[in-house]
């Protein structure tokens, strides 16, 4: 078999990029769970300061920061040997009430690793998988990821688009929020329409 070295190197380079992205995804989840992004959004910190602020170990934090800076997820200030999030990074990585919650999106992918063995079996048998059989991280992630859209659009846009719904809820109707997940939409409607009864 004749191997084209240029194609081989190109393919290996692509695969290494994908591998790096997979590792980076895990590190995003770690940074989110430990509050590292939120701390860096508040102020510029050295690795020791970030570790102290978040109750973590400096050595691990230093390695995490090096990865995140190399990947463009945090900014590095060489003069002070400190790190921070710029406005755009902070919006996407440290504000789970904002319009973009990237750690939540990464958590959706995390589910695939949790259900991998089940997926392998399904490939062999052709079986399916019920929504409720996914790992709990998927449900937390979808709630976080879609919350911004619900907050921005449910009350001002989506409900008024349905004829008579807002009026009925204002007057004191009853509503069943089917497939409501962790109940973000149900809670939003219950707060907006206190005369109505909501089940979700």
Task: List PLM regions with ranges.
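Conserved beta-strand/loop positions that form the S-adenosyl-L-methionine
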Residues: 178
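Conserved SAM-binding motif I beta-strand of class I
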Residues: 197-200
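Conserved Class I S-adenosyl-L-methionine-dependent methyltransferase catalytic core
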Residues: 2, 6, 14-33, 38-39, ...
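Conserved SAM-binding loop of SAM-dependent methyltransferases across substrates and taxa
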Residues: 182-195
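A short acidic, leucine-rich amphipathic alpha-helix
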Residues: 49-54
